[in-house]
Amino acid sequence: MMQYSDRTWALMRDAGLKMVFLGAESGSLETLKRMDKGGQMTPEKTLEMVRRMKSYGIVPELSFVMGNPPDPEADAHQTMNFIRQVKQLNPAAEIIMYLYTPVPLAGDLYDEAQAEGFAFPQTLEEWVSPAWLNFSQRRSLTMPWIKRPLHKQLHDFERVLNAYYPTSTDTRLTGARRRVLKLLSSWRYHTRIYRSPLELRALHRLIAYQRPETSGF
C-alpha cells in the first residue's frame, strides 16, 4: 500500500474507505525477520503507513503478536513501547493485541515452542475443547512460554491503553464518557504505571469496552 499514489489514496478516501486492517505483528525488526512472512515489513514502514493514512483521514487498525520467543518478555515490552509510538503519531489508530501462538510450520519460532513443551492436539475432541478454542482466538493462558506475570503485564497495559485511547468504532461512547476514561487513565499512561489498574477495571464494568476486532463502525 505504500506504493499507492496520492491520487489512489484520495480516491479510496472519497469512495468511503474508513479503516484498513494491517498485520503490523511486532515492534521488533528481529521478530519480524523471524516471522518470515515473505514481505519487507519493518517497524519504520509501519509508522510511515500510519502517518500516511492519518493524512487521508483513514484509520489504521493494527494487530500485534505479543510475547514471541526466544525472549517473550523483552519482545512484549519492545512492542508495547512501539504501540505508544504509533498512538503518539496517530491517536485514532486501533490496536489489537494477541498472544503469540505457533503455527505448525518448520522454523525457529515453532521449534522453540516445541522445546517449551508445546504440542498441537491429536484428536478432534481435543481440538474442540474449551482450552483449544481459546488458543484459536490467541488469548489462551496455557502457552508455556508466556508466564502468568507477563500475561498480567500485557492485560494491564491493554486496559490502560484502551481507557486512554477509547476505540473510535464504539458509537455508544459519548464525548463525556471518553473524557472520563482518558482522565482517569492519563496518570498511568504517562507514568507507565500499568500494574493493577483496579479503578479502570471498575470503570470498564460501567462503560464496557468494545473490541475493534469484533465490532466495527
Q: What are the residue ranges of the model-derived segments?
A:
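Membrane-proximal basic amphipathic "stem/tether" segments
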Residues: 156-159, 163-217
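A structural motif corresponding to the C-terminal lobe/cap of the Radical SAM core domain
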Residues: 1-176
